[in-house]
Amino acid sequence: MDGREYWDRQAATYDRATAWLEPRLLAPARQWVAQRVRGRTLDVAVGTGANLSYLRSRADELVVTDQSEAMLARARDRAAAQGLAITAVQADAARLPWPDAHFDTVVCTLALCCVPDEVAVLAEMRRVTRPGGLVLVADHVESSTVLGRAVQRGLDVLGRRHGEHHRRRPLLRLGQAGLVPVEHDSSRYRLVERVAAQHAS
């Protein structure tokens, strides 16, 4: 089963599956990202659209993309329920269909853990962000605790079939994608890390 098929199957139950984590761990990361959004904004790997309620008051124009059409359908429904105008485009995060420097802000939350090549996606995010714009990332990353890392190693084994990686650290890969961090922080025990970055040159 490829990634697109897997996420198509997960779309109907994803929000229920993450309902416990959402207010405790995920929503604070979404809020941190949204507070830094400005201008024309792209949400990469939007999933079911959980970011939309946070982004709606910050972005002048909101474009969303996901490889999964089923996930995009959920995001469209959520936007419609909120009276929010979005442009939704099915696309591979590593091959975004927009020209260079097209967006003021590009966002990816809780999805770099699920892509085959996180550096390729970060590089694409950089490419479509204008110089001086922001690339904003939030994701679950390698924990700062021994117990946390042990649990994550087990989750990596379980998630191998559908390409989940619980111990990546996008912050440490920014340079390979032509980005430099301008701000970052993390949740308790570094379960989720939040990063704002700009073009390195």
Stretches found by the model and what they are:
Residues 1-12:
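N-terminal, positively charged/glycine-rich alpha-helical extensions of SAM-dependent methyltransferases
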